[in-house]
From Swiss-Prot:
Superkingdom of origin: Bacteria
Keyword Cytoplasm: yes
Protein name: Nucleoid-associated protein MCA1327
Segments forming a coiled coil: none
Functional note: Binds to DNA and alters its conformation. May be involved in regulation of gene expression, nucleoid organization and DNA protection.
The entry's keywords: Cytoplasm, DNA-binding
Record-linked Gene3D superfamilies: Nucleoid-associated protein YbaB-like domain
InterPro entries in UniProt: YbaB-like_sf, YbaB/EbfC
Organism of provenance: Methylococcus capsulatus (strain ATCC 33009 / NCIMB 11132 / Bath)
Length: 107
């Protein structure tokens, strides 16, 4: 008969390996976010690092404040998309441990 503690340790090790792999997948994923109907686009990775900002040339320089708002909105859209991706990827992982959906892990 297998030792229950050894079994628990094996499960914890498998969880840690799967968790690490999932974190790496999330970090490598690129998200495209936008605002203003596509006037401002931001590409960011799963670590919430902005990789590229694209501004439609139709935005004139006089619209500086509008542009600032659109960039902030596109960035926030990207952050929400990364959070959703992380939640979706982690749901299966945490569910296997009996952790309730929506429970935010501190990492």
């Amino acid at each position: 008969m297998k030792n229950p503690l050894a079994n628990l340790m094996q499960q914890a090790q498998r969880f840690q390996e799967t968790f690490q792999k999932t974190q790496e997948e999330i970090a490598a994923t690129e998200i495209q976010a936008e605002s203003g109907g596509g006037l401002v686009k931001i590409r960011m990775n799963g670590k919430r690092e902005v990789l590229k900002v694209e501004i439609d040339p139709s935005l004139r320089q006089e619209e500086h404040e509008v542009l600032e708002d659109l960039i902030a909105a596109a960035f926030n859209d990207g952050v929400r998309r990364v959070a959703k991706l992380k939640q979706e990827k982690m749901a299966g992982l945490t569910g296997s441990l009996g952790i309730p959906p929506g429970f935010n892990l501190p990492f």
